[in-house]
Amino acid sequence: MAHGRRDDEEACPPTRGPRALLVFEDRAESILLRRLRPGFRHCFCLVQSGANWIVCDPLKTRVELTLVTAPNAGCLALQLARPGRIVLVGEVGPATARRRPRLRPFTCVEAVMRVLCIEAGLVLTPYQLFRHLLGSAAPRRWSITGEAGAEIHLDRVGN
């Protein structure tokens, strides 16, 4: 045992989570959304599952789940990055056994943070989430993808 860790913890480093994309965009369908920073009025995420990606888009009246196929995270990020959107590329965080109870409104930010296992107690808006993930205090690295330089066509899987 070294420095309070068990030997098996040192021999087996923690596994990385599935690849993930986090998309920030400007939606102003609601008067409340117009009060948020332009370009950061809504967010949704995609999580890789084999050759497919599960899109989780938390909307006002429902959570929309869609399955898409893409060759890799970079190609999918380029497809999603268009004017008015910012795409972050990263990975799903480790699931923690014990979580503090969250008494917060169930917004797009809260849904995305739960899907991606992001712990950020004071984050309530899409822009705050963006800053948190790119800030130095974030536990893992996320990177920005710029506007699409190439067009990639995604085939929808299933019905």
Describe the residue ranges of each PLM region.
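GIY-YIG nuclease catalytic motif and its immediate N-terminal context
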Residues: 1-30, 34-35
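Short amphipathic alpha-helical segments, especially helix-boundary/capping motifs
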Residues: 17-20, 51-53, 85-90
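Solvent-exposed, well-ordered amphipathic alpha-helical segments
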Residues: 16-19, 48, 113-118
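Activation targets extended, charge/polar-rich intrinsically disordered C-terminal tails
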Residues: 8, 98-159
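Aromatic/basic micro-patches that form nucleic-acid/chromatin recognition or nuclease catalytic surfaces
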Residues: 63, 68-111
